Swiss-Prot record:
GO BP: any one term: response to antibiotic
Binding site for ATP: G45, A46, S47, G48, S49, G50, K51, S52
Protein name: Macrolide export ATP-binding/permease protein MacB 1/2
Membrane topology: Multi-pass membrane protein
Subunit structure: Homodimer.
Gene: macB1
Subcellular locations according to the entry: Cell inner membrane
Amino acid sequence: MAETGAPLIRLRGVGREYPSGEGVLRVLTDIDLDIGQGEFVAVMGASGSGKSTLMNILGCLDRPSSGSYRMDGREVARLGAGELAALRRETFGFIFQRYHLLSEMTALGNVEVPAIYRGLPADARRARARDLLERLGLGDRTGHRPGQLSGGQQQRVSIARALVNDARVILADEPTGALDSRSGDEVLGILERLNAEGRTVVIVTHDPRVAARAHRVVEIADGRIVADRRTGAPAADPGPGPAQAPQPAPQPAPVQAPVQARVQARAAVPVLGRLAEALRMALLSMRAHKLRSFLTMLGIIIGIASVVSVVALGEGSRRQVLQNIAGLGTNTLQIFPGRDFGDMRSGRVTTLVTADAAALARQPHVASVSPTVGTSATLRHGATEASAQISGVGEQYFDVAGVALTQGRGFDEADVAAMGQNVVIDENTRTSLFGDGPALGQVFMAGKVPLRVIGVAEAQNRGPGGSTSLTVYAPYTTVQARYLGSTSVSGLTLRVADDVDMALAEQMVADILTRRHGTRDFFIVNNDQIRQTITSTTQTLALLIAAIAVISLVVGGIGVMNIMLVSVTERIGEIGLRMAVGARRGDIRAQFLIEAVLVCVIGGIAGILAALGFGLAFERMSSDFTLVYSPLSMLAALASACAIGLAFGYLPAVNAAKLDPVKALQKG
């Protein structure tokens, strides 16, 4: 607590020095100064005398290298960064020679900034800021940006900003230095009225005429106080006038509350509310630098679009491959004569016969079996001729191989037993022979054998570009007797029961046929193994391409970090101003971190839209292949964008939060 009768501000033996080469530069030496509540003090000195450094120490923007500074009885040197921010936010109001207004914000928005960090509700602080501007004669300029205001108007905006938190102490650094004489007199008149209301006003100036308006002048030269005198200036009449400052509005902390209580008191500032304000300010910054923001997020757009498109491409490829393999049947084994594909002696192997199919069909692990034989023939219908593959199969083949019928029916056991001439043709054959006309019931010649159409099956093995081969499915007995003149078959297609392991079933089939033939003169193709191998290969390729796309995403993140680091340098003055009006280091860090995340999220959304656009264009160019987009991959892409914003925005945000407010204001 403050000592009874103690001054509001007390400095004893305060010195400030900076490293300079191998030595130090002493700017202030043994400063002893007391300033009471309600005083109007001018600190006057030539350029380089140390007066601005003294003001920075008074306003807790800088720390003394030596000595003691007590504010309302509390030692300032013992305050942490957060407590100093609270002191600047709740006790001091700063007026700068160069105004330090944020160019992307309106006059009203600039005045609101300190109240944002104090945690006032949006409606309350907006009403407070508007009232201040109206009382300072800027009621019709609340929506103007700094570039649309004169110097005097900008300085009045900065005065309103200093008052929005009902500051007890006004610190003005050369407040009239950049103004004409009339505007300067208006500003000094406002400061006099503020002092008349009971506020402590400290002006830093080099102009004796400005200093003469104060009640007390402290002269400083070469870092030392050389004079401290009263001027005898009369107190200002706080009567009505266009430049009259507003009466203090009720605030969370009373005007006369001691600093210790004000620093320790913490307003109930909802975290979400502060984050919402940081988000709003980030949007304002992005809108003020549209091209830079777009170029920053361009790398993210490309990276996210690449990742989403590659995932969609991989899923589309996987489904296309599985669709093609589905033509081979589900849970199927195919048995062929010979040692393997390309066996020169396979044509002389005649031991694979229909009796093998019957033997396998009796096994409990086998759902169905169909012998297969094949030949080719020329089809004729009217004046139309076409070459086709004649596939001799059993009545169960369509179920075994998963061939779907689009019209009619398949042949039955009676057709197989009677070597009947009822056949099923595929869609390609139907189109080739009959065009758009009816196919069911039509008779055509296959070589010298007349065949009647009883069903139409979907075309098989449709990959990119489609298949143009013609296929006729006939009873295998018909093909053996009427085309081949042999009882052997070219293969067996077997469907395994759903609850049986494919590898075990393959081994059991091999054992049965080996016993029947006396040797292993056949080989087995496990379609599920092919499916798994191709699916695994497709996924591996998709992961490889996705890894390349992720690299582009990381490069985009590095670009975000680079631009944000540049942004910190460009906006160093803004950072200093925000700290001066009470922003915590966490507030600065959150603002830049949210800005980085926002850039990445907007870039991520744009990247997803770009990927969807690419998919539509791709479908127009290739109707046989479709990119399959996954909502999960899109959510993962947005999550990745957020993570990249957090990861690559952290360093710039930390750098911004570590800035010294004095150095930031000087460089800005």
